[in-house]
Amino acid sequence: MDDIKDMPLHKPVMVEEVLDYLHPQPGHIILDCTVGGGGHAIKILDKIKPDGFLIGIDKDMEILQTTKQSLSKTAGKFKLYHADYSDIDEVLRQADIDKVNGVLLDLGVSSLQFDQADRGFSFAKEAPLDMRMDRSCGITAQNLIRRLSETELAELLWKYGEERRSRRIARAILKEEKGVGITTTRQLAAIVERVVPRGKGKIHPATRVFQALRIAVNKELENLEIFLDKIYNYMAVGARIVIISFH
């Protein structure tokens, strides 16, 4: 198991763009809904100090423990919450905050999570087929596969991964599951690779499959819809929302 405390500081993506569009100012209250390793949060705190306040949310408790140490080294005021951003109303109630001036979401899996082999997000490393961002609750990718029919799995791979060969892949996965069983990342990747040979210069055949399973396991799109329905009730006049997504 890789210890997250020993990993290098997470380098946030599109920092200048985030600061430009979010436009944090001294005294602002900013909501970082996927605070992760704190890369964006540190930059935001520098812009809103001394009287601003940052609320950081993440469903990954393991990352939050390290992030708190990193943010404590700044002069900014902040509070971190172990929660999903779909529970934003409860988080803001606990923080006693009515309105915010800015909101940031960096969707998907972080590089910190990806680099932790035992999390199961990467097929490049042998690991249990987990994929949960919050390992204290929810269903693992391994158990999700066991619960689905061939049709359901194929639909999931198409809906969340836009995988054109979803039915062939689903059939091969469930055949293996009913036989020897599927318990690890590389085992799953090998099954997909047998069905869809890797083309020259193209992404690994299992990329879309892993993406689809991760999105389903963590209910990423459902939680995003819930969040977007709620957040406008807490936006101050002139507030901004910045969402980063790569798929």
Residue ranges and their predicted role:
Residues 1-247:
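S-adenosyl-L-methionine-dependent methyltransferase catalytic core, i.e., the SAM/SAH-binding region
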